[in-house]
């Protein structure tokens, strides 16, 4: 399996200047080969990498940069081009690769060779070819059987330097259980970040203080003369405020996704178009700050790492559809309780959505039929849902499903098993 481990570098002022020079040289190499790409047909990363030795004869600065680093710069350009083509094939509107200005290119990568971890003087240091030894805050050990494949050195907008080790371990991820015992459906939101089928609701992270400090720092920056020493000092303060927000949010998402990946055997979530949701009018700031896409990506790779089934289902109608009988009924966003006009089933709005997500996830990944050896909890769930058809209408209703009616007006009573299970989960 492949993992990334990130550590803080503590270079001296001289080393930090040399690292910055290396980054800027790599930026110029990137722009050089981008210029060639725009003027030359039928080029590839391999053919362009073969030009580096001759380029060093005319460009003396390149002799101070490790050969593998320069090769990765060219590879990075063509990886970006491949990503751009892939998005275009998927129907996205794309432009062209852009020339990198100073400050827009912040990292360089060693691969296969040119680096080594040392601990001869009681403190761990990273040795990099052409650069020397750099002290590192080695706050956690790498796995004993891990092999370092790549070393990426990156400068954050705050001016801090970090190193990311790309390591490979020989073991395969654990096998996913054939008959999962603990299954959970997760509905994400803004006020309650997650609400699952076990009745667990996690409140969204409060970032109001961090946002207030960021806005105050941005106002101070707007009053500085652009490019002055005071402007640069305040720019770093703004970058630090952004970093505070990012770290607090990522810490919250890492802990939450780690909990679900390790606690359950089967996790079902909505396949959300996070970018499309942010572009919708109204409440875009809260949607962007929720970082649902980041949470789902974290949850997916951690489920793969821990041997947990992960399935993303179509989110359409999960809130409107009744988890008991399958009838769809419109409800405004401010209505936080689900009350079915067909069967009378009542539950928290998010709990009802979570059960629908779990139902769709089980059908998508494990099939619509039931296994003889599934857990009693899942047996109860299937008992509650086995009579449901794919249609969204009940057997018989007195009024249309869009009309708010009393449950006694409805002939079909739904399934009491799921009603009892969900009601008990919500009350916990």
List where the protein language model places each region.
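Gly/Thr-rich phosphate-binding beta-strand-loop-beta motif of the actin/hexokinase/Hsp70
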Residues: 11, 179-197, 350
């Amino acid at each position: 399996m492949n993992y990334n481990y990130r550590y803080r570098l503590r270079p001296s002022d001289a080393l930090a200047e040399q690292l910055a020079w290396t980054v800027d040289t790599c930026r110029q190499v990137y722009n050089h080969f981008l210029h060639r790409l725009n003027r030359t047909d039928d080029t590839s990363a391999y053919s362009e990498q073969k030009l580096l030795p001759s380029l060093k004869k005319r460009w003396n600065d390149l002799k101070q940069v490790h050969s593998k680093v320069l090769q990765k710069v060219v590879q990075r350009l063509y990886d970006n081009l491949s990503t751009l083509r892939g998005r275009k094939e998927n129907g996205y509107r794309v432009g062209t690769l852009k020339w990198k200005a100073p400050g827009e290119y912040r990292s360089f990568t060693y691969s296969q060779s040119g680096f080594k971890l040392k601990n001869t003087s009681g403190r761990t240091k990273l040795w990099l070819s052409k650069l020397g030894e750099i002290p590192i805050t080695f706050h956690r050990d790498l796995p004993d059987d891990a092999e370092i494949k790549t070393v990426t050195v990156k400068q954050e907008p705050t001016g801090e330097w970090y190193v990311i080790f790309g390591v490979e371990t020989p073991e395969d991820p654990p096998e996913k259980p054939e008959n999962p015992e603990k299954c959970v459906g997760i509905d994400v939101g803004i006020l309650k970040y997650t609400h699952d089928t076990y009745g667990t609701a996690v409140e969204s992270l409060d970032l109001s203080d961090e946002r207030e400090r960021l806005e105050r720092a941005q106002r101070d920056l707007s009053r500085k003369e652009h490019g002055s020493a005071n402007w640069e000092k305040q720019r770093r303060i703004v970058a630090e405020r952004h970093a505070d927000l990012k770290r607090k949010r990522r810490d919250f998402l890492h802990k939450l996704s780690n909990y679900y990946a390790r606690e359950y055997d089967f996790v079902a979530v909505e396949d959300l178009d996070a970018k499309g949701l942010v572009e919708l009018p109204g409440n875009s700031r809260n949607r962007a700050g929720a970082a649902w896409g980041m949470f789902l990506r974290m949850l997916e790779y951690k489920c793969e790492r821990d041997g947990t089934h992960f399935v993303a289902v179509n989110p359409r109608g999960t809130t409107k559809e009744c988890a008991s009988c399958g009838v769809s009924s419109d409800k405004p966003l401010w209505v936080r309780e689900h009350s079915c006009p067909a069967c009378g089933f009542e539950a928290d709005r998010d709990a009802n959505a979570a059960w629908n997500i779990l139902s769709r996830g089980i059908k998508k990944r494990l099939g619509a039929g039931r296994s003889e050896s599934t857990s009693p909890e899942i047996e109860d769930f299937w008992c509650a849902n086995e009579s449901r058809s794919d249609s969204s209408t009940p057997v018989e209703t007195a009024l249309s499903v869009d009309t708010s009616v009393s449950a006694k007006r409805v002939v079909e009573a739904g399934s009491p098993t799921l009603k009892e299970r969900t009601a008990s989960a919500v009350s916990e």
